[in-house]
């Protein structure tokens, strides 16, 4: 089952990981070993989850690094599909 418009995975970090535990962005950044700006950009949908961040999120909150990356991939693909009609490619096979 695919979602037509999956949310940015940074929202999952904010609403499923940080807020339920009462963790601020500053505290979360320290837990994850990243800068406050990096985590702030992620939870405000301005940055993507990298493979390294996926590992950090898994170590801190669980869920599996692969799951975090799948959330990001689903979001990225949905964004790209919005513009698929503008992509001009000649089919060769």
Placement of each model-derived feature along the sequence:
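DNA-binding alpha-helical recognition surfaces that contact promoter or target DNA
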Residues: 41, 55, 70
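Alpha-helical DNA-recognition elements
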Residues: 41, 45, 74
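A short, Lys/Arg-rich alpha-helix, primarily the initiator
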Residues: 1-23, 70
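Short, charged recognition helix plus adjacent turn
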Residues: 63, 67-93
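Short, basic-rich loop-to-helix N-cap that marks the start of a DNA-contacting helix
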Residues: 46-59
């Amino acid at each position: 089952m695919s979602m037509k418009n999956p949310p940015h995975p940074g929202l999952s970090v904010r609403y499923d990981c940080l807020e339920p535990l009462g963790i601020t962005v500053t505290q979360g950044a320290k837990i994850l070993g990243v800068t406050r700006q990096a985590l702030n950009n992620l939870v405000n949908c301005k940055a993507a989850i990298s493979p390294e961040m996926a590992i950090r999120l898994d170590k801190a909150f669980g869920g599996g690094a692969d799951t975090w990356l799948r959330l990001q991939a689903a979001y990225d693909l949905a964004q790209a599909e919005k513009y698929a009609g503008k992509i001009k490619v000649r089919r060769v096979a």
